[in-house]
Amino acid sequence: MPRTISLAVVPGDGIGPEVVHEALRVLREAVPADVSLDTTQYPFGAGHFLETGQILTDSDLAALAQHDAILLGAVGGDPRDARLAGGIIERGLLLKLRFAFDHYINLRPTALLPGVASPLAAPGQVDFVVVREGTEGPYAGNGGVLRRGTEHEIATEVSVNTAHGVERTVRFAFELAEKRDRKRVTLVHKTNVLTFAGSLWQRTVDRVAAEHPDVTVDYLHVDATMIFLVTDPSRFDVIVSDNLFGDIITDLAAAISGGIGLAASGNVNPTGAFPSMFEPVHGSAPDIAGQQKADPTAAILSVALLLDHLGLSEAAARVSAAVSDDLAARATGDAAPRSTAEVGDAILRALSTNH
C-alpha cells in the first residue's frame, strides 16, 4: 500500500547541513518504491538563535509534532561566543524537544564493523545497544542555587526517577533483547551508593525479567561497566541505564567502536504519540564547516535507525549493509581522505549495487 513519510529536517549548524545532505540522498535511495518522502526543512540551531533571538517556540513545536520523524544534523556555534554560553542551544532545543515529545528512550547501537580500527588491542565481537532513559534523572532540571557567588553557595541537582519512567525504559530494553540473538540485558547503575534510585531500578528489572524467561539478566556498577567496556566489550548485548550513566556509557562505547564520527542515535517515543528524532552523535564542528571534511557516516546510520523505527526494517538493513561495505572498502582501498560528498557517493553506490 502506498505510504508517505513526513520528515522534519533540521540541518543545524556547522557540518550539520553537509552530513544531512548526504543522509537524505541515501534515505531517498533506500525507501521502497511504494514509499514517498515528504521533507520540510527547519532552520533551528545556534545560527537561527543569533539571527532571531529565538531557539524553539511553541508554534515550532506544534509544527514539528505533525511529522512522522525528525532528522537532525548537529547544533552549536563557536564555543567562544558568550551569547551561546551555558549550553543555551542544547537546553533550549535538544532537551526541550526531548521533554516536549517525551523521548524517553535514547537508543545508541554500538558495533565494531569490519575495517574499522578500535583503540582496543583485542576488542572481540562488539555488538551491543545502550538503552538510556531520556527524560528523567539529573537532567530533569530539578535543582537550584542558594547564595550564588559567596563562600556559602549551595548548588543542588536532584536525580528524578519515577516508577513509570523506569518501568517503560526497562520494558523497552527487554523487548529489544528478545529480538536479538544473545537475549541479554545488563542493568548499569550504582546501587551500593545511590540506594533509593538504584533500588527502584533493580526492583523494576527483577519484576520485568520474570516476564521474559528467555532473557539473561545481570547487573554491573557503572564504574565496573567502564572497565569492561575497555577490557571485554563483547560481554554486552543490551545495556539499560538511567539518563546520566547512559550518557557517559554511550560516549565510551562510541570511542571503542570507531569514534563518534560513526555513532548514530535515536531519541525515541516508542508509542508514536510524538515524532522521534534521529541524529549523529558528533557535534557541529564549526572549525571545518563548509570544507567537505566531515564524515557523513554517522548521519547515514541515523537514517538506518529512522527507517527501522518507522517499520521499514529491510530498508534499514540495506543502509547498514551499504555502510559496512564502504567501511570495509576504506580499510583495503586508497587511504587518501575523501570529501563528505565522496563518502556519500560511495555508500550510495554500495546501496544501489549490492543491496
Swiss-Prot record:
Question: What domain of life does the native source organism fall in?
Answer: Bacteria
User: According to UniProt, where does the site described as Important for catalysis lie?
Assistant: Y139, K190
Entry binding sites for NAD(+)? G283, S284, A285, P286, D287, I288, A289, G290, Q291, Q292, K293, A294, D295
Write out the residues that bind Mg(2+). D223, D247, D251
What is a GO molecular function of this protein?
A: magnesium ion binding
Question: Pathway, per Swiss-Prot/TrEMBL?
Answer: Amino-acid biosynthesis; L-leucine biosynthesis; L-leucine from 3-methyl-2-oxobutanoate: step 3/4
- Predominant place of localization: cytoplasm
Biological process (GO) annotations held by this record are:
L-leucine biosynthetic process
Q: Which GO terms describe its cellular component?
A: cytoplasm
Tell me the cofactor note.
Answer: Binds 1 Mg(2+) or Mn(2+) ion per subunit.
The reaction(s) catalysed by this protein are: (2R,3S)-3-isopropylmalate + NAD(+) = 4-methyl-2-oxopentanoate + CO2 + NADH
Q: Which cofactor does it need?
A: Mg(2+); Mn(2+)
Q: What is its EC number?
A: 1.1.1.85
Q: Which Gene3D superfamilies match?
A: Isopropylmalate Dehydrogenase
Q: Where in the cell is it found?
A: Cytoplasm
* Broadest EC class assigned to this enzyme: oxidoreductase
User: Where do the annotations place substrate binding?
Assistant: R98, R108, R132, D223
Query: What keywords would UniProt list here?
Result: Amino-acid biosynthesis, Branched-chain amino acid biosynthesis, Cytoplasm, Leucine biosynthesis, Magnesium, Manganese, Metal-binding, NAD, Oxidoreductase
According to the record's subunit comment, the protein's assembly and interactions are: Homodimer.
- State the family named in the UniProt similarity comment for this chain: Belongs to the isocitrate and isopropylmalate dehydrogenases family. LeuB type 2 subfamily.
The entry's function note states:
Catalyzes the oxidation of 3-carboxy-2-hydroxy-4-methylpentanoate (3-isopropylmalate) to 3-carboxy-4-methyl-2-oxopentanoate. The product decarboxylates to 4-methyl-2 oxopentanoate.
PANTHER family hit by this protein: D-MALATE DEHYDROGENASE [DECARBOXYLATING]
Q: What is this protein called?
A: 3-isopropylmalate dehydrogenase
What's the encoding gene here? leuB
